[in-house]
Amino acid sequence: MKLDVFAGQEISELSMIEVARAILEERGRDNDMYFSDLVNEIQNYLGKSDADIRYALPFFYTDLNTDGSFIPLGENKWGLRSWYAIDEIDEEIITLEDEEDGAPKRKKKRVNAFMDGDEDAIDYSADDPEDEDFVRESSDIEYDEEDPDDEKSEVESYDSELNEIIPEDDFEEVDLNEEDEEDEEEEE
């Protein structure tokens, strides 16, 4: 691939975001690109190794999102913001969504750029609990409404335990009024 914009410049000094902008400008408005295709084109143009691209990928994606000249078009497709008037951006995205409603969706195979064909590696996205539908399991424990008989039996058992510790015969009856009178005398 040859980009005329960079004629006379050292390819190794170009940033991935500059190359992405040039690639999208050369392809034109009707040729928006998937993110993975865009990264592959950049890698081919810059001649970078897979390891270099893997290292730079998170930074490039962040730059792509924060740079005001790029716009996500849905389904991980990207285009240039200059291709769309402000009012047209929402219409274009809605139109893409409307067109898809008629055709059945095929699931695309997920490609993990960091797996690198290593069979021993653990793919953590395969067991993501958010991907599964939530099903509430019924519990075996049933809660009854309060039963007054249960409360009485609890009180009786509590009283019997207290009687075992301190028999009822040992309790002294205290007149509450006597205590109040004693407190008043002490205060004087």
Curated annotation (Swiss-Prot):
RNAP is composed of a core of 2 alpha, a beta and a beta' subunits. The core is associated with a delta subunit and one of several sigma factors. Belongs to the RpoE family. This is Probable DNA-directed RNA polymerase subunit delta. NCBIfam families: RNAP_delt_lowGC. GO terms for molecular function: DNA-directed RNA polymerase activity. It holds the Pfam family HARE-HTH. GO terms for biological process: DNA-templated transcription; regulation of DNA-templated transcription. It comes from Streptococcus equi subsp. equi (strain 4047).
